[in-house]
Regions:
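Alpha-helical structural elements of signaling/regulatory helical domains
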Residues: 12-15, 129
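Substrate-binding clefts and substrate-entry loops adjacent to catalytic sites
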Residues: 1-8, 33-35
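Conserved short loop/turn motifs at secondary-structure junctions
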Residues: 7-10, 37-43
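Short, charged, amphipathic alpha-helices and their helix-cap/turn boundaries
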Residues: 14-32
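Generic structural marker for isolated residues within well-ordered, non-membrane alpha-helices
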Residues: 3, 20, 84
């Protein structure tokens, strides 16, 4: 309902879906085609797990989006809405993102978590064990993530010959630590 309401405020359903598809192209999502704002089944509505992960990582850069998908509960007057994403309660560092189910696609989940300043996104499609699988995927990603220092600040990378200068060569040094994350 919320997705349809937003679409209505953004020029109507067709205009909003066009904006969604334009943004997908801008983000380089070549295997994504939207037909509705809700993510429910549609004749030509499709994407991939990889592209959903890329879209989620992009969307989480928006503070408002991140706040909404990471909210466990919201009370407005006498009504309390509870987020269906169980990882927000069960997984340390969980920050959202999207749960879903249709008969055609089964249980689909896009999740994200942050630890030690690092964000990881996981996606499963048609997965009946999605909550446990995501906890394992996120755990594995955080456990296998390594940061290697390639050089420290001030390291001489090479000497460059200076023709006609006051010195025959000058040292090129790194301004800050260089790290490789993998």
């Amino acid at each position: 309902d919320a997705a349809l309401a937003v679409a209505g405020e953004c020029g109507g359903l067709d205009a909003f879906v066009k904006k969604m598809n334009d943004k997908a192209k801008t983000l380089g999502l070549k295997n994504t085609q939207f037909e509705n704002p809700s993510g429910l089944d549609g004749e030509g509505h499709h994407t991939t797990a990889k592209e959903l992960a890329r879209l989620a990582a992009y969307a989480l850069k928006n503070d408002t989006f991140a706040e909404i998908v990471g909210t466990k509960e919201y009370t407005n007057g006498t009504r309390t809405l509870r987020n269906h994403n169980k990882l927000l309660w069960r997984y340390d560092g969980a920050i959202g993102v999207k749960t879903g189910f249709t008969k055609k696609c089964g249980r689909c989940l896009v999740s994200a978590a942050k630890r030690n300043g690092r964000m990881v996104v996981a996606v499963t499609l048609n997965d009946g064990n999605d909550w446990n699988d995501h906890m394992e995927l996120l755990d594995e990603a955080f456990a296998s993530y390594k940061e290697h220092t390639m050089h420290t600040a001030g390291t001489t990378v090479r000497e460059i010959e200076i023709i006609g200068g006051t010195k025959p060569e000058v040292a090129v040094k790194t301004a800050k630590d260089g790290t490789l994350s993998c």
